[in-house]
Amino acid sequence: MTRKMTRKTNRSGNSGGKTGGNRARNRKTSNRKTGNRKSLVPKNLRRKLRNTWNKASLKQRIGMIATTLVATVAAIAIIAGLIRFVGWRVQVSEAKAAQSEMRSLYDFNPGNIISDGAFFNGNALSERQVQTILDQQGATCTGDKCLKTMTFTTQSQAADEYCQAYKGGQNESAAAIIYKAGNACGISQKVLLTVLQKEQHLLTATDPSDFQFKSAMGLSCPDDANCDAKYAGFFNQVYGAAKRYQYYVRHESQYAYHAGALNYVRYNPNAGCGGSDVYIENKATALLYIYTPYQPNEAALKAGAGEGDACSTYGNRNFAIIYNSMFGNPRD
């Protein structure tokens, strides 16, 4: 009898022990679960928010939900904007590094071909200084169509938002037109002389054709179309180009190239030749790309003043080379 009672007590003890252990484990598990669910919002604030929600009308609840959604969307937009900005900064840094390397290797920076100070200086040269340059560059020209001795009839131009008034006349020399156009429109005479040489080699031509004078600055003469007759003639080309540059300044947003931004600039009219992102550093360089929308590829730069490959274009490369040869570094 005593033995049976002892065994029963032992079984009860074992049973009780298991139950106690289970309870202990359950308490630990419960504590862990509670810890996992612990809110980051303070208890008092949770209670206040709950009371506010419970007391709110349907309209107020809808307003609270809408406010929360708007705040969430705004936060997401801010984060997305920051991500884009950081990505843009990385792209700009990479573009600037590539441009710096090109400048070191070839003395050409596609993002800073010429400084604003050098470009927008309408008093860079006097009429006499322009004539001296024409005489020097055209020293081997002896015919009756040399730019240094040619004269033209010019038309008076009223002042407008782009240029000051230009007083026309009979038998104006090329030097007078270049000086007066640059002075009226605030464009460097050095730039105008450089473009005349870049586009039609008029400064050094020994027997220039009528077409060279008609399209002297390449104004409204795209690579893939005929020239606009409205701008034909030496005066129309020189004065028109100076005015067009100022038009570009005031309407830059209408064009594809912008200062202080990354711009994709192609190497060639053929899109298959590719291009690269260029961080354009100033307005003058942006205007050159609006006027001539291509950059030299590496083959063109390696060639110096020579020819590159089938994808090479030379307009902006030649601008830098010609300007530098006559007037020094265009970036100074």
Outline where the language-model segments fall.
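Peptidoglycan-targeting cell-wall enzymes and recognition modules
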Residues: 114, 118-179, 184, 191-193, ...
